[in-house]
Amino acid sequence: MSKYLIINADDFGYNPQQTKAIDELMRGKLITSTSLMTVAPDAANAAELARLGGYPVGVHLTINTDDSKKRWQSNSGAPSLSEKGMGLYESQVGLALHARRRDVRAELEAQYNFISSRGVEVDHADNHCATLYGINGRRFYIDAYNFCAEHSLPYRFPKTPGFLSRQIDREAPSVIKCFQKIIVGAGERRGNV
């Protein structure tokens, strides 16, 4: 089996400055891939740059916001992903408590369609802020796995416990590490992790 080094910059479309930086890196062949964040403010511009440049682009599946002052809006309008009509949840806890899996799934499709409808081929998927990795206690990872399988997309998913420790800023408890192995195994059996 051949191995390839992929150097990916995610959050393409996050803001005009980041979009410009990633575009320059792609044009300069300093990175080999990017992941477009369709709910972010500069997403349409990033998609156009990707189309014009023929860039390898993934969908950076995002169901939360990073901006509490100007919250991002979902692409699907799924009600359970929006906090009191203000936009996507900033809080991982709020998202975990309120998001419905059918709304998560609808949002994943809407984000894929945002990119593909602009003439850009989506070649992989990954996730913003680990919201689809199962560490929030929700089974959104199943929705992500099924979505990727249906679209024949590889899914970038952390396979080592070191990722978990960095996410929670301490050594991950044994039960969490065990759960992560189960989630990784499920993805590997589906063939998209």
Where are these regions (language model features)?
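Active-site beta->alpha N-cap acidic-glycine motif
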Residues: M1-D66
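Hydrophobic faces of well-ordered beta-strands that scaffold small-molecule active sites
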Residues: L5-D10, T32-L36, V57-L61, D123-N127, ...
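Acidic-and-aromatic substrate-binding clefts and catalytic sites of carbohydrate-active enzymes
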Residues: F12-P16, S35-N45, N64-K70, C129-R139, ...
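Acidic (Asp/Glu)-rich catalytic clusters
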Residues: I22-G28, A44-P56, R71-E83, S116-R118, ...
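Short, basic, helix/turn surface patches
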Residues: G58-S68, G85-L88, Q180-G191
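Active-site gating/metal-coordination segments in enzymes
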Residues: I63-V122
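Catalytic domains of cell-wall/extracellular-matrix polysaccharide-remodeling enzymes
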Residues: E109-G185, R189
